[in-house]
Amino acid sequence: MDRIQKEASVEELNGIFSEAGSVVMAHYNGMTVAEMTELRAKLRELGGTFKVVRNRLAKIALQGKPGEGAADLFTGPVAIAYSEDFVAAPKVLVEYAKSNDKLVILGGFMEEDVFDAAGIDALSKMPSREELIATISARLMGQASQVAQRLMAPAQGLAGAIDVIREKADA
């Protein structure tokens, strides 16, 4: 890899580290091409990416960035998984690591917060952005319908009273 390619790689990593919701680092030693392809496909389904990186270039790209504390994790054969959704990459990697002991999660970062493997595991158990939005909107809609019912109750009671008076007048 010549200097120009290295500079381009550092620029690409700068963009990844700046724009990703979360970045997870993992050792992939011993994984077959088929296993890595399967992992990449699972990540792609959730908008994530799995990329093998050169440690020295990743450390250079992290200098002065919010996730700079995670630079120590770049030792040995390291790949990064990242996604815009801050829980997508951790969820897929933790799930995949349970079934494949060749993938070892080292840690990761989300903005300024650096996590070890246990932190990534905890992050993977959080609901995704879409799940949070669905939960919040369901709660808001439930409360809105309760308010509407309470506002309509007096009018419904008045309509019922008018019907009773009309029935008595007709009889």
From Swiss-Prot:
SUPFAM superfamilies the UniProt entry points to: Ribosomal protein L10-like
Keywords: Ribonucleoprotein, Ribosomal protein, RNA-binding, rRNA-binding
Keyword rRNA-binding in record: yes
InterPro entries: Ribosomal_uL10, Ribosomal_uL10-like_sf, Ribosomal_uL10_bac, Ribosomal_uL10_bac_type, Ribosomal_uL10_CS_bac
A GO molecular-function annotation: large ribosomal subunit rRNA binding
An annotated GO cellular component: large ribosomal subunit
An individual GO BP term: translation
Keyword Ribonucleoprotein among UniProt keywords: yes
Pfam entry (one): Ribosomal_L10
Top-level division of the source organism's lineage: Bacteria
Alphabetical list of CDD domains matching this protein: Ribosomal_L10
Coiled coil regions, renumbered to chain: none
Subunit comment: Part of the ribosomal stalk of the 50S ribosomal subunit. The N-terminus interacts with L11 and the large rRNA to form the base of the stalk. The C-terminus forms an elongated spine to which L12 dimers bind in a sequential fashion forming a multimeric L10(L12)X complex.
Stated role: Forms part of the ribosomal stalk, playing a central role in the interaction of the ribosome with GTP-bound translation factors.
Similarity section: Belongs to the universal ribosomal protein uL10 family.
Protein name: Large ribosomal subunit protein uL10
Protein's organism: Maricaulis maris (strain MCS10) (Caulobacter maris)
Source organism phylogeny: Bacteria, Pseudomonadati, Pseudomonadota, Alphaproteobacteria, Maricaulales
